[in-house]
Curated annotation (Swiss-Prot):
GO terms for cellular component: cytoplasm; small ribosomal subunit. PROSITE patterns: RIBOSOMAL_S19. Gene3D superfamilies: 30s Ribosomal Protein S19, Chain A (3.30.860.10). This is Small ribosomal subunit protein uS19. It holds the Pfam family Ribosomal_S19. InterPro entries: Ribosomal_uS19 (IPR002222), Ribosomal_uS19_bac-type (IPR005732), Ribosomal_uS19_CS (IPR020934), Ribosomal_uS19_SF (IPR023575). Protein S19 forms a complex with S13 that binds strongly to the 16S ribosomal RNA. It comes from the Bacteria. HAMAP family: Ribosomal_uS19.
Amino acid sequence: MARSTKKGPFIDGHLMKKVLAAKEAGDKKPIKTWSRRSVIFPEFIGLTINVHNGRQFIPVFITENHVGYKLGEFAPTRTFKGHKGSVQKKVG
């Protein structure tokens, strides 16, 4: 179910502080976060955010097309290696 529009988008406070500090300083160093649930705001454009996927941090460079999505959408947590296929036995 989608979030109610009257509540507005969600962002963790500590992440917003880090983003604003990086924008003020003009720092291009990646921001490390575990907050996959935070919505991407226009202030994030041009920054690289390392999003944790449960095992490692995935770098996500934020562009205008990312605004409105959640950070977790760009760091997949599951790897699909394919279904087990029929194994061909060698004859001979």
